[in-house]
């Protein structure tokens, strides 16, 4: 067997595929992050060692603001290149939909670095509007108001416009026109109105129903004409300045995007022919992230195009339609929040313990007193061969099923059941090893890898930190951040620490394809084993919930300065006290109740005074501690 190399690990976990220019493996066999164009490598194992010194324990979310900056620059650069190539005369506006990640430090970094690119923000609810109008200080930057709206939402947006904010209120439903007209008249404001169009075209992938006829938002063609008539009657003809469309998030196929762009461009042309001087087109979201690194439209976790190709299609389609109809090029808005933010966050979790399926003892050999099923199964194991392995496996399954049935009826004892189980799994391991060497593995053996996988119990909550992995089977690249110069000798599924059977991960990125097991190393005693979960910067933080009352994790901001990394900020994860307060427990009252109970227990002689003090001290300490295992 040839010596394992770092290149083997790169290939095994397809790091060069999904890591783009941001993630890789160094000569020590550790995962690193390269946030900036200056190629400074941040060793993730070194970061975790430093955080351990600072008493910051896993799970911990590492945020790299420099990657956010780089993604903004990359998108802007792609538009600049496309504008030059297609002689585009309009302006491009990158708009960040804060629903993707509303965390204040993330939004603040995007706004701060986005100033020189005139980056705007999008809100889809009243709370988001309150955040956006307060933090978006640049008067030229666009604020797009989407989502359901009531009178107070619209009046707040229009008053902000009156004071100088560049706000577009997008009509999603017919009833919003009356609300906008009434608020505009009341406040004496000429609103910037956008209309969301329900395209017939839809996206591809997990969110394709966000577009097309089944989509939740937008006006159909007949409704659009009715809306325009109503706006004319309200003397708001000249206020209609923007059309908006959205065909879904994480669109996997560029052809779907091209089709939608052509349809939207014709809406733009038709509205100009009707006398509406639309000068903005909001292309919505959809620019995907290649989570598995396959660059394939057949995978819901990948895309078959680049940012540059996406931008080229956006610009070319509207330039072509405009030039053919001799109308101005529209200003183009894109809301590519996933593409901007996914790469900047890495979740680091530690493995607490592992379990494996039983296997037959090396010295085991059946005796005359053993049950006949034990002898039969041992003979199957002893005579296994590639030629007969499928038949052997079928026989082993039959013997195991028979043994379980006999045990349930009290005929087979516990020792016999245990021996048969151990031998059965040993047979499965041998059969799996033989099947893997075959050119064409029998279909019924393809699930053996998953059946035989170890369970690695990790210190995190799937529901809090990776909700999309649970809810929609989203793939995230997961890689050990150390020992990548060693051959991984185990296959595992990952289990979280919630009391929920769904709290597990059994889909992984490996070898340019999805796998039900993750290749990992044997855990060493007294040594931390960390796994990095990558590309988690979009949606995961904000969608996470408190199942089993596991709260937000520790979060750390890391930047590159003077050719080295710096830990800029550490945000403590939620404490037990904080999550109990969320579900309406009063921590102080809980302590008082326990003090009364402990006092009674001491007086009745159930525990000593010292034991009572120790119990209360542990309880108070736990209240102010991390919700995860420390």
Ranges and model annotations:
Residues 58, 62, 84-89, 274-278, ...:
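Flexible, glycine/charged-enriched surface loops at secondary-structure junctions
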Residues 25-102:
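Low-complexity, highly charged intrinsically disordered N-terminal segments
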Residues 66-74, 226, 263, 313:
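A non-catalytic, amphipathic alpha-helix used as a structural packing/dimerization or gating element
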